[in-house]
């Protein structure tokens, strides 16, 4: 943010959230980390706090969908039997137009800010753990190994930079877990409601309803998208939605000769689309709590999920699917 004029600050916030979420593999973690900065930036520049927090949440959904250490990516590739790096390439090409247009929209809407963003001091050293995790994931290092490496590096950087003493390592880790308590409880309650929906046949009805209406390859892809989106509405958890619909999506993709990389990408994309605009989803609940606004106020400014859906539908309709040789 040091190098950006105030008019580009909201767009810069979106880019930072994209980078952090792709490195961390978690949208909720990204929102919790950047929400305070969004609030302070709004106060300093005069930008609407809703716009600022929406930029953070939109960027968070970018990484939640794309990151190779994200649980949604892992669930999608495991259920479809493809490689993470292959899914990443295809998924990236699908959502890139949406990300670019989103950036432009945030810049245009924020143009005319009058304040100055106070970025404070920063250290390149503290960025190293994020870069290691991001690069390690991109080159295909085992997820568990790269996450453990990132955690150890973060602790080393924290101690060497004076952020905390080595004797406080476990308390710092504990504080991180404790900070997620409220949203975890809410997520558990929503998951319980989703389990009740499944137990009483709601999810099975959705699956039958969608499958009966699939007749062509394009229809199959739209059906997969609708299926995972509907299940995410019911469960408010995109990972759970992908796991629950993964097997039926694989059956449909094999029947209609759809590339597994494409199916994995569509599952992840449309689960993220819905998750990003659910007022009772963990992401918007955490964003609204951090900014002190209603989730319903944020939803109209969640440009990225909307554009991601448009981009994916255009891809389905105009890009023929053929299985990888």
Q: What kind of feature is each model-predicted range?
A:
Residues 1-8, 118-191, 205-209, 213-214:
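Hydrophobic transmembrane alpha-helices of multi-pass solute/ion transporters
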């Amino acid at each position: 943010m040091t190098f950006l004029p105030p008019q580009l600050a909201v767009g810069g916030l979106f880019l930072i959230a994209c980078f952090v979420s792709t490195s961390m593999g978690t949208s909720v973690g990204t929102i919790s980390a950047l929400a305070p900065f969004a609030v302070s930036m709004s106060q300093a520049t005069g930008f609407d706090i809703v716009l600022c927090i929406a930029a953070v949440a939109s960027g968070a959904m970018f990484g939640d969908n794309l990151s190779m250490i994200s649980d949604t990516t892992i669930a999608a590739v495991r259920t479809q039997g493809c490689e993470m790096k292959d899914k990443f390439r295809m998924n990236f090409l699908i959502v890139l137009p949406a990300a670019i247009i989103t950036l432009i929209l945030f810049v245009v809407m924020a143009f005319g800010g009058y304040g100055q963003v106070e970025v404070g001091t920063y250290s390149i050293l503290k960025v190293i753990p994020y870069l290691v995790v991001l690069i390690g994931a991109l080159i295909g290092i085992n997820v568990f190994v790269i996450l453990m490496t990132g955690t150890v590096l973060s602790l080393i950087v924290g101690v060497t930079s004076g952020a905390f003493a080595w004797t406080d390592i476990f308390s710092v880790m504990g504080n991180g877990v404790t900070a997620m308590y409220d949203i975890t409880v809410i997520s558990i309650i929503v998951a319980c409601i989703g389990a009740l929906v499944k137990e009483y046949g709601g999810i099975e009805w959705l699956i039958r309803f969608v499958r009966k209406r699939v007749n062509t390859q394009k229809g199959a892809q739209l059906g997969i998208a609708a299926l995972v989106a509907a299940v995410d509405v019911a469960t408010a958890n995109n990972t759970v939605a992908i796991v629950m619909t993964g097997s039926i999506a694989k059956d449909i993709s094999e029947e209609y000769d759809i590339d597994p990389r494409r199916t994995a990408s569509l599952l992840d994309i449309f689960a993220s689309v819905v998750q990003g605009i659910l007022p009772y989803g963990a992401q918007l609940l955490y964003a609204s709590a951090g900014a002190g606004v209603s989730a319903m106020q944020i939803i109209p400014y969640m440009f990225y999920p909307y554009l991601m859906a448009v981009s994916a539908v255009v891809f389905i309709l105009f890009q023929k699917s053929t299985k990888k040789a």
